[in-house]
A protein has these predicted regions:
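Conserved alpha-helical scaffold segments that buttress catalytic/binding sites
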Residues: 2-292
Length: 292
């Protein structure tokens, strides 16, 4: 019997715990630098530090709050460059926004789309107005125009993408069931998969996060993971919840402009328990899908 790869917790914020067999790296000292976003020099410093700390073999990586989704880029950089694969992201946001100060949790998909080993990037479950007309100019258009990136959205008016010539990189649906059926119907099961799940793609009926949330149910994630069985070469999960007060006024302003509020600690603890129960279920499913 092949042993499951041990889950790995990159513990910046204390949000993730109680995952059986997980390896935990304490990284709280990096929280102020890395959370929400950072300069490229800081990102590279963390990347170098983790090279000495991360185990040689690990399974699904948990990064804590969705404020750390840009760490997916760091994890992608660790994969062998000679192997082509598809990047499948579940997220209520495109994470393909312009950010001139380095990399942040809402811009990393653009940088991932530039990696030559990635055949295509799919972002499933977008319900955010980040891809609506009012924010069209904030999106990186180049990966959409090159057809390297596809948005799979639910109930967002994205007609502007047709106007700029990127209509074929957008799939619009009125219900998450329709979206998942359509995606799985065209899914290339012969190509390895890196799977990145931000739990803000889920309805608040499932779990709560500190970001605006989408309409997916847990079953939609289960269906996707099952379809990837035998092809997953890497996976990460973010979208857990934690309370943090930035020392940086700039980060406090950025966070507030994205609609984030500082949560009471009692509320955080209740939500974390629900999140950790879901995390354990996701790990069990992902462990069935590794490419051997």
């Amino acid at each position: 019997m092949i042993q499951d790869r041990p889950p790995l917790i990159l513990d910046f914020d204390g949000a993730v715990s109680d995952i059986p067999g997980a390896i935990t790296l304490p990284l709280q000292a990096w929280q102020e630098k890395i959370r929400f976003g950072c300069r490229w020099a800081q990102f590279k410093q963390l990347e170098t530090a983790l090279q000495a700390q991360m185990p040689g073999d690990y399974g699904c990586v948990f990064t804590g709050s969705g404020d750390y989704h840009h760490l997916s880029q760091l994890l992608l950089n660790r994969l062998p460059t000679q192997q082509k694969f598809q990047l499948i992201i579940c997220d209520n946001h495109p994470d393909n926004m312009r950010y001139p100060f380095g990399i942040h949790c809402g811009s990393w998909v653009y940088w991932a789309s530039r990696l030559p080993q990635i055949e295509h990037v799919h972002v499933l479950g977008i319900g955010s107005q980040d891809i609506g007309l009012g924010h069209a100019w904030e999106n990186h258009w180049s990966p959409l125009l090159k057809r390297k990136l596809t948005y799979w959205n639910i109930n967002v008016d994205t007609r502007w993408m047709n106007w700029v010539g990127a209509g074929r990189s957008n799939r619009a649906f009125s219900h998450p069931d329709e979206l998942m059926r359509a995606f799985l119907a065209q899914f290339d099961r012969s190509l390895p998969v890196y799977l990145s799940i931000d739990k803000d793609v889920l309805s608040p009926e499932v779990v709560n996060t500190n970001w605006d949330q989408g309409e997916f149910l847990e079953q939609h994630l289960n269906d996707l993971i099952s379809a990837c069985q035998g092809q997953i070469i890497g996976a990460d999960v973010t979208g857990d919840v934690s309370a943090y007060h930035y020392e940086s006024k700039f980060k406090r302003w950025l966070s507030a402009s994205d609609g984030q509020e500082e949560l009471p600690e009692a509320q955080v603890q209740i939500w974390q328990q629900q999140q950790n129960e879901l995390n354990s279920r996701l790990v069990a499913r992902i462990n069935q899908g590794w490419r051997r």
